[in-house]
Swiss-Prot record:
Name of one Pfam family that matches: FlgI
MF terms in GO: structural molecule activity
Family per record: Belongs to the FlgI family.
GO cellular component assignments: bacterial-type flagellum basal body, distal rod, P ring; outer membrane-bounded periplasmic space
Protein name: Flagellar P-ring protein
GO BP terms in the entry: bacterial-type flagellum-dependent cell motility
Taxonomy, superkingdom: Bacteria
Record note on quaternary structure: The basal body constitutes a major portion of the flagellar organelle and consists of four rings (L,P,S, and M) mounted on a central rod.
Annotated organism of origin: Campylobacter jejuni subsp. jejuni serotype O:23/36 (strain 81-176)
Gene: flgI
Signal peptide interval: 1-16
Key words, A-Z: Bacterial flagellum, Periplasm, Signal
Subcellular location: Periplasm; Bacterial flagellum basal body
Length: 348
């Protein structure tokens, strides 16, 4: 039976974090790269003859090696056309390794065990910034409809690309230094201003709005030294609750205290009722699932004690009922849409 893996984040409501954990330095960012390539060596799980662009790509590749083949004569199913994406970090240097994501474009069944051939990765300006090549592994997953393992047509290759071109940077000469909060919040912006001005003993920070803090470097410090000191300062921070669901691996990551409000929803043949009664007990036809949950097998209804209605508990109980990861994802989305989950929901 396919199950969803649940990770709980145990944390206090308010704790100290470094500024670099809650804010980015404006101008210091990743750049997206993309390329088109071929994965070969697949065990009959590649693109079929209906993926004409794959056949044409194979023909073009062979023609570059002085081998002429008509695309219509190619019948191999051991090759798949893929899009390759990567992030080029700020200040990346020639020779640095990048992680890449390889995703099938055609009707391939799996990329497992294949090899990505030399693929140029370009930026938005059309220039080549990295070259990718290497063996593909999808983590040993096999395609299974409706649950974890259904994404063997995409894979991440660690260190699968080499940086060939650097993006020019003038950070050391930049006089306009700005912090941008990852999550807009007036209190956090104000706290950053207060802490930095106290630490440096002068007005080096000014909160402009809920996301922006302008910085003014002291004359006796370089940009690098100044930003290093800025980003390591601690501030009091209350994180925004979030539930993250990895659709590919079937993993739920949630804070231990992410609660679900009283609600009644139905998905396919499963009904979920969050009982506002904190002292609910099992009815005559219900089975006690422990952890405050009761299931009625005749109607496939899951009733949960409001005091125990957290995202983690609901996901765990749905697992016990045999719900697929895709079902659980859909239920979480519906709970969020109904305003019952007091947290941001992110599907990756």
């Amino acid at each position: 039976m396919r199950v969803l893996t649940i990770f709980l984040l145990f944390m206090t409501s308010i704790f100290a974090v470094q500024i670099k954990d809650v804010a980015n330095t404006v101008g210091v960012r990743d750049n997206q790269l993309i390329g088109y390539g071929l994965v070969v060596g697949l065990n009959g799980s590649g693109d079929g003859t209906s993926s004409k662009f794959t056949l044409q790509s194979i023909s073009n590749l062979l023609q570059g090696m002085n081998i002429k083949v008509d695309p219509n004569d190619i019948k191999s199913k051991n090759t798949a056309a893929v899009m390759v994406t990567a992030k080029l970090p700020a200040f990346a240097k020639s020779g640095d390794k990048l992680d890449i994501t390889v995703s099938s474009m055609g009707d391939a069944k799996s990329l497992q065990g294949g090899t990505l051939l030399l693929t140029a990765l370009r930026g938005i300006d059309g220039e080549i910034y990295a070259i990718a090549q290497g063996s593909i592994s999808t983590g040993g997953l096999t395609p299974r409809p409706g649950g974890a393992g259904s994404h063997s047509t995409a894979a991440t290759v660690m260190g699968g690309a080499n940086v060939e071109r650097e993006i020019p940077q003038n950070f050391s000469q930049n006089s306009d230094l700005t912090l941008s909060l990852k999550v807009a919040d007036f209190k956090t912006a104000n706290d950053i201003e207060r802490v930095l001005n106290t630490v440096f003993g002068e007005e080096v920070a000014k909160a402009i709005d809920s996301r922006t803090v302008k910085l003014k470097k002291p004359e006796d410090l370089s940009n690098v030294d100044f930003m290093a000191r800025v980003l390591e300062q601690d501030i009091a921070y209350k994180p925004q609750s979030k539930v993250i669901i990895d659709e590919r691996t079937g993993t739920v990551i949630a804070g231990v205290d992410v609660e679900v409000e009283p609600v009644l929803i139905t998905h396919k043949d499963i009904t979920i009722k969050i009982d506002p009664n904190n002292n609910a007990v099992a009815n005559q036809n219900e089975i006690d699932m422990k952890d405050g949950g009761f299931v009625d097998p005749s109607s496939n209804t899951l009733r949960i004690n409001n005091a125990k209605s957290t995202v983690a508990n609901i996901a765990r109980m749905l697992n016990k009922l045999g719900a697929t990861p895709n079902d659980i994802i859909a239920i979480m989305e519906n709970l969020k849409r109904a305003g019952a989950i007091n947290a941001d929901l992110e599907i990756i």
